[in-house]
Curated annotation (Swiss-Prot):
Family: Belongs to the TRAFAC class translation factor GTPase superfamily. Classic translation factor GTPase family. IF-2 subfamily.
Organism: Geobacillus stearothermophilus (Bacillus stearothermophilus)
Positions of the UniProt region annotated as Disordered: 48-158
Basic residues composition bias: residue spans: 127-139
Record's compositionally biased regions (Basic and acidic residues): 48-74, 107-123
Major localization class: cytoplasm
Gene3D superfamilies: 1.10.10.2480, P-loop containing nucleotide triphosphate hydrolases, Translation factors, Translation initiation factor IF- 2, domain 3
Location of region: G3: 297-300
The protein's name: Translation initiation factor IF-2
GO molecular function: GTP binding; GTPase activity; translation initiation factor activity
Lineage: Bacteria, Bacillati, Bacillota, Bacilli, Bacillales
Top-level taxon in the UniProt lineage: Bacteria
């Protein structure tokens, strides 16, 4: 005997699944539900349990049939007539019961009447059961009419396959199968599921019912096209073709980024720009040895980071331009850290080799400190010595770009709907919203309905980097398009859809979703919730950006932070530099989900605004041990700060007055917030904290005041400090107690 499930056995025995489960529990056989599998020996035991009942039932049925057969000749008996519900018979029985003298005559009349009524009753019951029989009277005609549609329903064929999305109600499933809802409810009951006609069925229940009917089931999975950034379309390997590499040129100011690109393109980009410094993101394509290379000329590295922060990698190769006569500069280090954080291969271009003071070996030596070791010195970083001015070494650089792109095996499918990224966007007076797009897969054509970020439209016109109109753009090709309803942001993703109606729906839905996201609180890593994230397994490494007042402090702080050892989490310093905390640091922290540590330095106004909008955690300290203790305590889950610093105002020192026995009086103008008499202050000079202390006196004209608001002038002295100079910034702050959650 083969195995079978509980519900199959219940169906075989024509009993509910719950009854079988109850029997099994009485036999000390544990089953969880009606889907449990029964072994052959268990099935045999169950058969023994159910067999005696079956025999008894058959015996009782046979006895009843025999009784009926023997009762047939005894039709005149009055006891039998009492079983029928005919009014006339009951009347006759009553009449027969009343007269005691005429009992025999009553019995004779009763016998004749009951014989006729019994025959009529049996004919009526037979017609009711079988849907047949003589159509005598109105009572017999009604059931025959009701049974007419039944044969038609049985003849209806079952579908070979049904599809559903999410779930189905009992009524919907019955309609798809072409069956009555009551039949489906009965089957569910046999499976141990109590359901009503409007009850939703899960996937398992739908599959069980359909398998019982021998119908194939297919579930439709809906894709949220509004979140098309998350949709990755897997292309077949045979559809992929080689695409041009996308190259970003990065480096320090005036090290020759735009001049290098100009030399490669044989155009005069630099002359068109104010002061020879790039003012916007440009995307250009050049041809080398019958192969194309796409260059992005970014203003420093802010746009590069912004695009990465938006969750999409655009650049394939980074060219790090370093002047041979200047060496590694702060922005060079920032560019290295940005490229490494994005896991993009770096090619170092040592520029200005035509200058007599050029020293490429010094540059190579300095870059070794940042793990960029030249190939000739046993490393894996490609170094190209060149001069953008004389065009010496350019061919070697371009060959190296093509070599790295071959190593990276950059491929894309051109035969699909286009997707890509916005490089630049602006509002043109004559043409309306204009966007420079970089196609990353597929082919963009004129007339395509398109969704770009949170806006939408139809591609009205396309212009390539040479200013010529084109009808289509393939992978890695930059084009400027018109036809959008609004100006998108640099770094936004775009996707082409089949029709403009759908593009509009998705564009509006994305705009609505962005509005909701802006209202909700963004979750960024902060020391306050760091331990919770570590505990939940969300954090494997803690990214830090370290800024300090002097190089010695930077090195000491980095060394101390890297020694912190907490099980399961490691500290990763993604950027360390000297100077005030800038907006660029906040951009990098946003892209890398990092915490900014400031040691003896302060964030500037733009950095503060960016940190507030992006919810980046900035920690400011003056004692190195406090930094280490705070980070270590946060990682171990012991961080419990009771007080939080709140900056209430800033004042700029416009003039100083030295008064004997008083000290230096600072004539100040309150630029932000307010300065209060009881607040603590710190003196900031060129972004570096010089002194922290308390206000000794605060006056307006000759009157002592409790506070001075924004836009007013005042005079103040700092307790035990007189080295105040014009141009210094006095920052007032208070310590507020924070209620811990």
């Amino acid at each position: 005997m083969s195995k079978m499930r509980v519900y199959e056995y219940a169906k075989k025995q024509n009993v509910p699944s719950k009854d079988v489960i109850h029997k099994l529990k009485e036999m000390n056989i544990e089953v969880n539900n009606h889907m449990a599998m029964l072994e052959a020996d268990v099935v045999e035991k169950l058969d023994h349990q159910y067999r005696p009942k079956a025999e008894k039932k058959t015996e009782t049925k046979n006895e009843k049939k025999a009784e009926k057969k023997t009762d047939k000749p005894k039709r005149p008996m009055p006891a039998k007539t009492a079983d029928f519900s005919d009014e006339e018979i009951f009347d006759d029985v009553k009449e027969a019961a009343k007269p005691a003298k005429k009992k025999g005559a009553a019995k004779g009349k009763e016998t004749k009447r009951t014989e006729a009524q019994q025959q009529e009753k049996k004919a009526f019951q037979a017609a009711k059961k079988k849907g047949k029989g003589p159509a005598k009277g109105k009572k017999q005609a009604a059931p025959a009419a009701k049974q007419v549609p039944q044969p038609a329903k049985k003849e209806k064929e079952l579908p070979k396959k049904i599809t559903f999305e999410g779930s189905l109600t009992v009524a919907e499933l019955a309609k798809k199968l072409g069956r009555e809802p009551s039949e489906i409810i009965k089957k569910l009951f046999m499976l141990g599921v109590m359901a009503t006609i409007n009850q939703d069925l899960d996937k398992d229940a739908i599959e069980l019912i359909c398998s019982d009917y021998g119908v194939e089931v297919e579930e439709k999975v809906t894709i949220d096209e509004t979140n098309f950034e998350a949709i990755e379309i897997a292309d077949a390997p045979e559809d992929l073709v080689e695409r041009p590499p996308v190259v970003t040129i990065m480096g320090h100011v005036d090290h020759g980024k735009t001049t290098l690109l100009d030399a490669i393109r044989h155009s005069k980009v630099t002359e068109q720009e104010a002061g020879g410094i790039t003012q916007h993101i440009g995307a250009y394509q050049v041809t080398v040895n019958d192969k194309k290379i796409t260059f992005l000329d970014t203003p420093g590295h802010e746009a590069f980071t912004t695009m990465r922060a938006r969750g999409r990698q655009v650049t394939d190769i980074v060219i790090l331009v370093v002047a041979a006569d200047d060496g590694v500069m702060p922005q060079t280090v920032e560019a290295i850290n940005h490229a490494k954080a994005a896991n993009v291969p770096i090619i170092v271009a040592i520029n200005k080799m035509d200058k007599p003071e050029a020293n490429p070996d010094r540059v190579m030596q300095e870059l070794m400190e940042y793990n960029l070791v030249p190939e000739e010195w046993g490393g894996d970083t490609i170094f190209c010595k060149l001069s953008a001015k004389t065009k010496e070494g350019l061919d070697h650089l371009l060959e190296m770009i093509l070599l790295v792109s071959e190593m990276e095996e950059l491929k894309a499918n051109p035969n699909r709907r286009a997707v890509g990224t916005v490089i630049e966007a602006k509002l043109d007076k004559g043409r309306g919203p204009v966007a420079t797009l970089l196609v990353q897969a597929g082919t963009l054509k004129v007339g395509d309905p398109i969704v770009v970020g949170t806006t939408y439209g139809r591609v009205r016109a396309m212009v390539n980097d040479s200013g010529r109109r084109v009808k289509e753009a393939g992978p890695s090709m930059p084009v400027e398009i018109t036809g959008l309803h609004d100006v998108p942001q640099a770094g936004d993703r775009f996707m082409v859809f089949e029709d403009e109606k759908k593009a509009r729906q998705i564009g509006e839905a994305r705009a609505q979703r962005q509005l909701q996201e802006q209202r909700s609180v963004k979750t960024r890593v902060s020391l306050d919730d760091l331990f919770e994230q570590i505990k939940q397994g969300e954090m494997k490494e803690l990214n830090l950006i370290v800024k300090a007042d002097v190089q010695g402090s930077v090195e000491a702080l980095v060394a101390a932070l890297q020694k912190i050892d907490v099980e399961g989490v490691r500290v990763k310093i993604i950027h360390a530099a000297v100077g005030a905390i800038t907006e660029s640091d906040i951009s990098l922290a946003t892209a890398s989900n990092a915490i900014v540590i400031g040691f003896n330095v302060r964030p500037d106004a733009n950095a503060k605004r960016a940190a507030e909008s992006e919810k980046v955690d900035i920690r400011l300290h003056r004692i190195i041990y406090n930094v280490i203790e705070e980070i270590e305590a946060a990682m171990k889950g012991m961080l419990d700060p009771e007080y939080e610093e709140k900056v209430i105002g800033q004042a700029e020192v416009r003039q100083t007055f030295k008064v004997s026995k008083v000290g230096t009086i600072a004539g100040c103008y309150v630029t932000d917030g307010k300065i209060t008499r009881d607040s603590k202050v710190r003196l900031i000079r060129q972004g570096i904290v010089v002194y922290e202390g308390e206000i000794d006196s605060l006056k307006r004209y000759k009157d002592d005041v409790r506070e001075v608001a924004q836009g007013y002038e005042c005079g103040l002295t700092i307790k035990n400090f007189n080295d105040i100079k014009e141009g210094d910034v006095i920052e007032a702050y208070v310590m507020q107690e924070v209620a811990r959650a």
